[in-house]
């Protein structure tokens, strides 16, 4: 099974691909979308969960999403049509790091997709190329709450702690105007949902080759989370504006 399919199945019951509740997502979007008529871009949109919420909450917003997964984009398009917002959503099958647009955006999102750019600061650099003057960037990325094991670093990356993460963002020329640190409940709910949704899909197909493969992937992920990074990993979402210019 390819990783894109595994990710789609794992997020079936938690379409926001980050450890955030619906209420946390709503607050973050409300802090980034201030007028209600913004052009919004999501770099690494997956199934479009962030954009669907933005469009549903703000009838004047138009949005564009970029992702490398055709399957995820198809899901986003179908969900947008079902919600009656498809006419305000444009989807691009493209590498988010290489995407370009002729018009700037008032809000640029990239939550949980820093790996596509090579880290948090490169993500901000990419977002800035699409950002209109005075616009907002909403990013979400991991940090270490505690000293990580070597295995955890190998799995997830060499993050900083929370103060250093925010300091790096500020030193890069950005000012946080809002933020959210995911709670233990949000972090655990996300991981239980990820592994549980994938495992449930697999158990319903226990006699099929993909069923066994998916069940093994869910089991491996659950073990790595519980043993290697549950105590150390944290997640922060930041709403940012350029400090000058």
Model-inferred region functions:
Residues 139-157:
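Short, glycine-/aromatic-enriched active-site segment of Class I SAM-dependent methyltransferases
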Residues 121-136:
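A short glycine-rich, Lys/Arg-flanked "PGG" loop and its adjoining helix->strand segment in the class I
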Residues 107-120:
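A short SAM/SAH-binding and catalytic strip from SAM-dependent methyltransferases
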Residues 97-108:
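A short acidic, Gly/Pro-enriched loop at the edge of an enzyme's catalytic core
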Residues 180-245:
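Conserved Class I S-adenosyl-L-methionine
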Residues 37-46:
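Conserved class I S-adenosyl-L-methionine
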Residues 49-97:
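Class I SAM-dependent methyltransferase SAM/SAH-binding core
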Residues 18-36:
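Conserved alpha-helix/loop element of class I SAM-dependent methyltransferases that forms part
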């Amino acid at each position: 099974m390819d990783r894109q399919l595994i990710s789609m199945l794992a997020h079936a019951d938690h379409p926001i691909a980050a450890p955030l509740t619906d209420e946390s997502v709503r607050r973050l979007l409300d802090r980034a979308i201030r007028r209600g008529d913004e052009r919004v871009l999501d770099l690494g949109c997956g199934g479009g969960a962030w954009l669907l919420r933005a469009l549903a909450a703000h009838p004047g917003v138009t949005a564009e999403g970029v992702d490398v997964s055709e399957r995820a984009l198809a899901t986003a398009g179908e969900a947008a049509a079902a919600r009656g917002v498809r006419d305000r959503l444009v989807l691009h099958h493209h590498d988010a790091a290489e995407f370009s647009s002729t018009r700037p955006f008032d809000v640029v999102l990239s939550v949980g997709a820093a790996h596509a750019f090579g880290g948090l600061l490169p993500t901000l650099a990419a977002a800035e190329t699409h950002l209109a003057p005075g616009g907002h960037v909403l990013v979400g990325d991991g940090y270490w709450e505690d000293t990580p094991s070597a295995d955890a670093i190998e799995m997830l990356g060499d993050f900083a702690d929370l103060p250093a993460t925010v300091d790096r963002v500020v030193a890069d020329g950005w000012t946080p105007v809002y933020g959210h640190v995911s709670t233990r409940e949000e972090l655990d709910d996300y991981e239980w949902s990820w592994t549980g949704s994938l495992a449930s899909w697999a158990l319903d197909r226990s006699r099929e080759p993909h069923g066994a493969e998916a069940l093994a992937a869910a089991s491996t992920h659950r073990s790595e989370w519980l043993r290697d990074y549950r105590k150390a990993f944290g997640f922060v979402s930041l709403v940012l504006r350029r400090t000058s210019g």
